[in-house]
Amino acid sequence: YRRQRQMCIRDSIYTPEMLKARHNKILTGLPDTYGRGRIVGDYRRVALYGIDYLIERKKADFAATNRQGMRRGDFQLREEIADQVRALQDMKVMAQSYGYDISEPAKNAREAVQWLYFGYLAAIKTQNGAAMSVGRVSTFLDIYIERDIEKGILTEKEAQELIDHLVMKFRMVKFARIPSYNQLFSGDPVWATLEVGGIG
């Protein structure tokens, strides 16, 4: 159970002075689902392991919390792990709605790009963060791309198209956000840093 900002207002946790300041627009707040700060998730894991393996590992983490003499922190940890399992299951359903099965690891560059994107899309749809970056994924994707080019199932031009389309998809996430986020900013900004290229 988590207390959201609107609950604080409704339950009168705010003092009368705070409520008056809110009413007069002196004190404002962001929507409860607004992700604050810069988040750089490891979206590669979806492509690398597949969702079923990630769910299996999280269920093992949950089972490892079964012990006698549980404390308050243990209950919170179990709740958080259960939320993570549910989120991974929801991501699998979301990908299926687009016609993809992400239960297994990506087998080629196209799948690696798509699986990685689904990880990012699931995160930004739930966090609504203005600054949720992708990070440096080019070295990771390059492994799949190089392998597919060597096999003759992908050309340099097609590889470039994959990356171009990925960048376009990152720019279009604004359409997946909830209305309360869009009320904050004009122009639906997206600060999604994607590092491509470089050495090391």
Residue ranges and their predicted role:
Residues D11-G200:
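Mature, well-folded catalytic/scaffold domains that follow N-terminal targeting or propeptide regions
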